Amino acid sequence: MIVAFCLYKYFPFGGLQRDFMRIASTVAARGHHVRVYTQSWEGDCPKAFELIQVPVKSHTNHGRNAEYYAWVQNHLKEHPADRVVGFNKMPGLDVYFAADVCYAEKVAQEKGFLYRLTSRYRHYAAFERATFEQGKSTKLMMLTDKQIADFQKHYQTEPERFQILPPGIYPDRKYSEQIPNSREIYRQKNGIKEQQNLLLQVGSDFGRKGVDRSIEALASLPESLRHNTLLFVVGQDKPRKFEALAEKLGVRSNVHFFSGRNDVSELMAAADLLLHPAYQEAAGIVLLEAITAGLPVLTTAVCGYAHYIADANCGTVIAEPFSQEQLNEVLRKALTQSPLRMAWAENARHYADTQDLYSLPEKAADIITGGLDG
């Protein structure tokens, strides 16, 4: 059977993109033909995928997305698929994977009346409505209960259309998959001295992920502690604004940016803490990757997956409304109390051993291929 996957952009280091890759690969491994429609593709593409790069010309994101949608619809009329799966919201999907927050709720919380008059707003609101409004048949694969509550608040979506997926962590991220003495070996590989503290932040879109908050927390540390602490920021974005902030706060030499690395599991083995003080995050797969790596986490309550950190007792969740002073204090405490970090790390490893943090691709593939397998 032919399963068509729709996503606007693919690059190897995005959370949505990684979930897409694992789900689509699982569907392909079950013997189905996987067709992918995308505006751009970075990195390797599995040979089993039929990759179609959709031509778009608009100078705006919402303009390109509208062109993409129209082109894909025309192509599907000529080359039908048995299932159409979206990783971005758009009309006509059989299944939607909700990697993002509710746009209507975000606008209600953050935007004023004038924003609602823009063509950008009209586009994104219409595409979300077409996915979630009552009477549609689109099956909705969700990551958190908070997402479901927000969408039902705005669209009164039928409850039976929602299905919560378990997380889907790559098995190679698990602490038990690392080589012996991985911490020492990977710290040496990255030029990190044993007495130095390594803070790690992973995720594209530095503004939304709260990289500024991490830099401010680093800068707030007592001088002797700050001098001995590094922050590695890994993700696809332009770091200039954040480099300038680090310079202004006197910690430029402590902060290192990487535009995407394929050795994140090694960095997690080498690090002392994961920082993820996000402003907005539908789920936050990196939080669970840290748990499975045995890496303590400092994060914010807005993250859909933050409750896992609390459940595992492997770090601290900063409540809303966010307090920079609280993050500063929690970071100082974590870095000066080694037994606390060790207890958090042990709790994380136990949680990784006893909870299902891994089966998202299989469960999603079951939903997508329901009625097609066999």
Curated annotation (Swiss-Prot):
Its main location: membrane. Pathway: Bacterial outer membrane biogenesis; LPS core biosynthesis. It is a peripheral membrane protein. Its EC number is 2.4.1.-. Inhibited by divalent metal ions such as Mg(2+), Mn(2+), Ca(2+), Zn(2+), Co(2+), Ni(2+) and Cu(2+). UDP-alpha-D-glucose binds at residues 15, 19, 173, 208-209, 261, 281, 283-286, 289. The keyword DNA damage does not apply. Residues 103-132 are annotated as: Membrane-interacting region. It is found in: Cell inner membrane. Disruption phenotype: Deletion mutant synthesizes shorter LPS, truncated immediately after the inner core heptose residues. Mutant cannot produce flagella, demonstrating that flagella assembly in E.coli depends on the length of LPS. Mutation results in a complete lack of phosphate groups on heptose II and in only 40% phosphate substitution at heptose I, which destabilizes the outer membrane. It causes a slight increase in susceptibility to novobiocin and a major increase in susceptibility to SDS. Identified as a drug target because if its activity could be inhibited, the integrity of the outer membrane would be compromised and the bacterium would be susceptible to antibiotics which are normally prevented from entering the cell. A selection of compounds was studied by molecular dynamics (MD) simulations to identify molecules that can act as inhibitors. GO terms for cellular component: plasma membrane. Glucosyltransferase involved in the biosynthesis of the core oligosaccharide region of lipopolysaccharide (LPS). Catalyzes the addition of the first outer-core glucose from UDP-glucose to the inner-core heptose II. Cannot use other sugar donors, such as UDP-galactose, UDP-glucuronic acid, UDP-galacuronic acid, GDP-mannose, ADP-glucose and GDP-glucose. In the absence of a lipid acceptor, can slowly hydrolyze UDP-glucose. Belongs to the glycosyltransferase group 1 family. Glycosyltransferase 4 subfamily. This is Lipopolysaccharide glucosyltransferase WaaG.
